[in-house]
């Protein structure tokens, strides 16, 4: 199988960024919305000036104005803007045109998720499919029914499709059986609320081993 793209999200300190920058992740994510992992654009700019990051950088937003997202994206030179709220396809299209960034739409695993993928598909570059947990936009560490992964990827064909929720070193091989194109995680590589180098390495080792055996 092809190795999935890997995104480490919810980076919230200089130390987190230093560890993630040295990891095998392809994407690093910062959350600019209300969350226990929320960071300020000003702090992120300082950290990015101190750490050499040779990865794609994503900013996560929830129901933020297009003007604010565009300003932050340009200031931080974001590669990806991830929309995690109630944004509409027209918002994604406008943001894409204004910033030149890749636009990803986060969707929750629900009965209508494939229809939502179809609704957004022409206006975004990728999707993040996460668990549906009442009162939460993501970062819960709860997995959804991964047997739905092939269906979602088929619906999103031609676009990036990341799977989030409940991914950690112990569950990674179960997810890999469904051949996800991308994996997005935050709490699964954290210890005491901070990114943990040992958990990152363990997850990467298990993923690499599974992929090499499956080739």
From Swiss-Prot:
Keywords: Amino-acid biosynthesis, Aromatic amino acid biosynthesis, Isomerase, Tryptophan biosynthesis. InterPro entries: Aldolase_TIM (IPR013785), PRAI_dom (IPR001240), RibuloseP-bd_barrel (IPR011060), TrpF_fam (IPR044643). The keyword Amino-acid biosynthesis applies. GO terms for molecular function: phosphoribosylanthranilate isomerase activity. It catalyses: N-(5-phospho-beta-D-ribosyl)anthranilate = 1-(2-carboxyphenylamino)-1-deoxy-D-ribulose 5-phosphate. Coiled coil: none annotated. Pathway: Amino-acid biosynthesis; L-tryptophan biosynthesis; L-tryptophan from chorismate: step 3/5. It is an enzyme of class 5 (isomerase). Its EC number is 5.3.1.24. It comes from the Bacteria. GO terms for biological process: L-tryptophan biosynthetic process. The keyword Iron-sulfur does not apply. Belongs to the TrpF family. This is N-(5'-phosphoribosyl)anthranilate isomerase. The lineage of its organism: Bacteria, Bacillati, Bacillota, Bacilli, Bacillales. The gene is trpF.
């Amino acid at each position: 199988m092809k190795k999935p793209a890997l995104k480490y999200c919810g980076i919230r300190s200089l130390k987190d960024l230093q560890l993630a920058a040295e990891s095998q992740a392809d994407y690093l994510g910062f959350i600019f919305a209300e969350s226990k992992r929320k960071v300020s654009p000003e702090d992120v700019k300082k950290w990015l000036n101190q750490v050499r990051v040779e990865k794609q950088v994503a900013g996560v937003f929830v129901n933020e104005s297009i003007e604010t997202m565009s300003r932050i994206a340009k200031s931080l030179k974001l590669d990806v803007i991830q929309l995690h709220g109630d944004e509409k396809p027209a918002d994604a299209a406008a943001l894409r045109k204004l910033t030149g960034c890749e636009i990803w739409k986060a969707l929750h695993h629900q009965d209508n998720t494939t229809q939502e993928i179809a609704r957004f598909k022409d206006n975004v570059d990728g999707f993040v499919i996460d668990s549906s947990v009442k009162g939460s936009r993501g970062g819960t560490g709860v997995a959804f029914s991964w047997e739905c992964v092939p269906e979602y990827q088929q619906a999103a064909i031609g676009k990036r499709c990341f799977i989030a929720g409940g991914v950690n070193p112990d569950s990674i091989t179960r997810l890999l059986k469904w051949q996800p194109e991308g994996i997005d995680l935050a709490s699964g590589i954290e210890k005491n609320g901070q990114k943990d180098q040992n958990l990152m390495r363990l997850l990467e080792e298990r993923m690499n081993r599974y992929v090499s055996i499956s080739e």
